[in-house]
Amino acid sequence: MSILTSPRGKVEVVHCRRTESQDIFCIKNLVRKFTQKLFGRLNIIYLLEKANLAVTVCNDKEEIMAHSIFLDYPNWNVAKQDNWIPLFRELDKEIPCTPLNTLFMHFFVAVDEYATGCLKEIIRTVFKAVPELYFIFLIVPTYLSLGSTLITVFDQVGNIPCLNYNEDFAVHICHRHNHYPQLHIRKARVEDHDDLMPIFMHYDNTLKEIYGEYFLAELIEAQDKDHHAVVCEVEGKAVGFMSVCTSVNLPLLHECFDLGPFHGFCTPHPDDILKPSREPSLEEGEEKHLKKCSTSLIIREMQIKTTLRFHLTPVRMAKIKNSETETSASCEEALPTVLGLVSEERLKQDMEKNLSILSLVDEEDVASSLSSSLLLSVESSHFRPLYLGDPIAFCIQLFCIDERYEARQVLISNVSLSLDFMSFVFSLFPGKNFCLISVPHLTPEFVLIQNFVKVVPFNNCTLDHDLYVFHRAGLLRSITIRLAKFLDTAGVEKLVSTLLLSTKILDDLAQYNEAGRDPDGTALQVFVAEVADQIVGIAVIRKEMDIEYIRSHYNIEDFIYFSHHQQEEHGRLNHFALNPIFRHYTKFFLKEILRLGYKSCLYYPVYPQTREGKLQSSYSHSLTSALHYLVPVRPRRQIVYPLEKLGINAPSKEVSKDQVSFALNHTNRKLTLEPKVTVNARIVVVGASSVGISFLETLVFCSHLKFNNLTLISTHGLPGKRLLHNEQRKFLASDHCFNDKDYALMSLCSWVNVVVGRMTAIDRAAKQVVVSKSEIVFYDHLILCTGLQYQVPCPTGADTEQHLTNREVLELSKQRYTGTVPSNLFILNDEEDCVRMLCWLRNSSILTEGKVIVYGNTLDAYTTVETLLNIGMKGSGIYFVHPPTESNITCINNNDVESAVEDALSAAGVTVFHDALLAQWNHGQHPDPIYNACFTTSTKPIRLECSAFFSFYKKNVDYETFKAFNDACLVYDGRLVIDTTFHTNDIAIRAAGSLTKFSNRYYSNEWTHSNFSSKEIGFQLAAAMLSLFDPTLEPVTEPPADLDRLIPMYKGAKIQGGILPGSYHYLHISKPAIPTPLNLQRSQPDFGSDVVTGNAKKGTYFRLYINNYKLVEAITCFSKEPFPSSNYIRLFGQHEQVLNNLCTRFDDKLIPDLYSYFTEPWCMALFHDRFIDLKKELRQILISKQEEDKPTMEEIAYRLEEEEINLNEKPQKYLQRVFEDSIYKSLLEKSILDYLHYNQYHLPMYAWPGII
């Protein structure tokens, strides 16, 4: 906030922010004729799309006071955007302008009264937002003066000609030091104490309480060769302090962090022990097989993830060689000794001697090492390398700076005469190459550490701090990005020699040098990063050929106005490799690629792994260290088109083609200077349920946040491995929250650490989760989303020889089975269980001659019976046993559908038993393996022979999970108890999903999260937590205690579906509700109407339930033919009139088949992902006041409802007539036509004015 005063004495409180699209209208109103003379006639929207930085000044009423746009190349076409540097260097050789430290002002407008103050505020904001920036150039025609405003900050440095026409332009410059304090770094003196103490006390008085009032003076006085205190001062006043020393607890760091990439912060020594001695016991026999299977089936997702994050974080920056000799040699080369003051020239000389200070890492090594370390069941002993060389690291003990000057603390980009902290402190320790700092996890990332590299901790790290490291060579600031040439080949080979796809990168480099394009004609560009005449980075981009597919399948328009970007301005990032020392230049590298390559957008796809466990598909995209500097783009929900029926009105093949799914990441010119808020809080999610996945998805796709410590603990890792080939035959029913394609489109493995194992304990005091009884995962926020699982059924033990009935037997469904678990008992809870069972079946003779029992009455039991029939099992070999139910509500809850399923089971020869309670296995003898099972019924007992037993009898909380809750003293009452904000009785532990129940104080035991959509629950859980991390959100205020009495009600549809016996495709969609028999619902006085077509037994059944508000509240589809489930899910909640007056047409017998009805061209817009946005826009028009003297349509409707208007006609007709005569009709029509026009690539079947 700043206060501006106009010449007339008016005062405005203003603040600066990034420009938003809704500012454009107000910005245009500020344009004057003089503005157009200075900057030309500009398309503001287009310019904003291509700007690197746009700043708007607002007052406290959010009225726009000023606006300015900055780009990284000159305006007025005085130079090409990729070659302006020589021209500006010639103007004044004393101005060392580079693409790194220079921006150009392309536009400025302001309210006249406050123009000068607003301009200075913008300039200060820009310098603060871009610490590397030192020069801002302004170019105007020579015949124009700058005016009274711009001349206050810009000075002329010369004239240059225009490329296009015969006219000269004046070049003006604005220097950082004129508008932002110049910091001077020096050794601290005792006299600085009085300046520094108020800064320390502003943040915390802990140090004063522990060490006394004069701790700072004592620290300054205690300086020696190993301890130094440094201050930065502005105008003679100390405003920042740093204490550094060589006392580093390296043994502790070795135990807690992976220091291998940095050679333990020691000089290489011949006796270093870098590899454990070979222990073949873990590599041979059964354990070798387990590791192989685990890698391919359980943690394959971690291989992509770890490699991506390794470069990014980066974790391993030096490839550990195979022998100690090689290691010593490589490390000697990798760690040069930089002596004396850190001058640019000296650093260049060191770089010329040996570039490989820290080399890139082979993705395969990374993936295999992390995969094995995270696979808890096969993790090797905690070997730590032994480094015998001299320590070459010092640490920052204490750091504090006045927040007004914090943004000035740049580590690598000072070209001013004074040196910043890092250059100065390295000069104090000429024999040290690494600077370390540890920061508590929950500390927001401050400017000082943004250019440090975060060191990855080991699994068993007990420190509650993150460790960051900065290498001396990172002070080099003369980095140049340019197009590659033939002479770069040797340098690139050295850079990428350890990368998995190094050959492909070198092939692309050779292809570019030879032809500049691929053999198929696709434009190809290769850029290199150069420091001290050495290649330190390479990027390969191609013209994006699938841009229409990307636009139609991903929400890329969340980040760009697509129509303002030309086809050739879209590029695909195929490879990106940068020496980790210069990781802080990644965004600059990307910005230069866009400038030099004449691109405005870059896309980077992450393909899912194949079943064989390859790191990437064969699409030749190497894993990139730039991933975390890109933003993940949400996939768009696609319409399933009836292509044959649409004919020539179907979308183009570019839109409708079925490609291999991939997750898309993106950057553009606007994002190159857009900061991300780093969140280091350790967020641990237990359970890969739909709730947990939805929670992680919501966090990952917050594009302005970067979560560094997301961890998922799951028995089988991330789902979505496509383990079952046939998508149409799943053993388990689906809740339609996520499928394999969704997982591929999200690529959570790129952002989430995955720990494969089972939670067995929670230590709330230490904030740690015990996994698989031995390993520890620390947390700051623990999210419990384990859900409910089918459990091993507990036989009642009833003696069937005594002919007991269910009434005479004690029901033990809630009792835990503690006996031997039979090897042929299958409890199917996820796809991994199904795969294991399927392998067992196919390796036995059961499919052809055995008998199986399917015990349960859930939808999963029905889909399993159908899948068994489908894979070749005879119906006569399947016993389908329904246990007694506690209510008269079935899992299908539709008599027509149930009757058709029963007939299909009978036709297939499946024997069905009802109300049968499991009594014994093997007559009460040893149960492994099961060869028969006895059941009691309401009449007489039954005994069934079997070769396998499938149990789907009642889901419950896993016992180990329950024990972890109970031992941790979390309140548990049949389910884990939570409040309305997902909190358990521990503020750091939240829970959600079917695992939970609301506290009894809400008096709502019948409502739990099980009644709602799991995907919506996960989203709401994430939304509740984001206020803790997202500075753009208002803090959530807790409601008064007496108001916290109502549970939240969510509106998302509850969905279940699958393939039922008889090969019937089944889908049921309903609103969240307490389950009630359908017949009872129909008997209620407020029941709406059913719209039903077809016959269940013929497989043509389609039911829509329209409530008394004429909204679709339930949908049931039951068909022999596959149908587009995702389309029908969009019908939920729609008004019947939106469905083309469905009820009227149905009553008039005009809709014989709803399946056919919803394949007609008119309804495609209903299935469009942006149809909901159109509805919101139309509603906003109706409730907004369009004419001063007339009420809105909403106000008229309210008056009718309150009977304030006397009518001689029906209210609906009156509303219709008023609407027809008002301006609202034309506004709505325009909005609808604009929607159809803008989305015509998805909806070409509709006519719009441009094609009429």
Swiss-Prot record:
InterPro entries: Acyl_CoA_acyltransferase, CFAP61, CFAP61_dimer, CFAP61_N, FAD/NAD-bd_sf. The keyword Methyltransferase does not apply. GO terms for biological process: cilium movement; cilium organization; flagellated sperm motility; sperm flagellum assembly; spermatid nucleus elongation. Disruption phenotype: CFAP61-null male mice are infertile. The epididymis contains fewer spermatozoa in the cauda and caput regions compared to wild-type animals, and spermatozoa exhibit short, bent, curled, thick or missing flagella, and are immobile. Acrosome morphology is normal. The length and motility of respiratory tract cilia is also normal. Transmembrane segments: none annotated. GO terms for cellular component: axoneme; motile cilium; radial spoke; radial spoke stalk; sperm flagellum. Expressed in testis, brain and lung; the expression in testis is higher than that in other organs. Detected in spermatozoa in seminiferous tubules (at protein level). Not detected in the respiratory tract cilia. SUPFAM superfamilies: Acyl-CoA N-acyltransferases (Nat) (SSF55729), FAD/NAD(P)-binding domain (SSF51905). The keyword Cytoplasm applies. Keywords: Cell projection, Cilium, Cytoplasm, Cytoskeleton, Flagellum. Involved in sperm flagellum assembly. Plays an essential role in the formation of the radial spokes in flagellum axoneme. This is Cilia- and flagella-associated protein 61. It comes from Mus musculus.
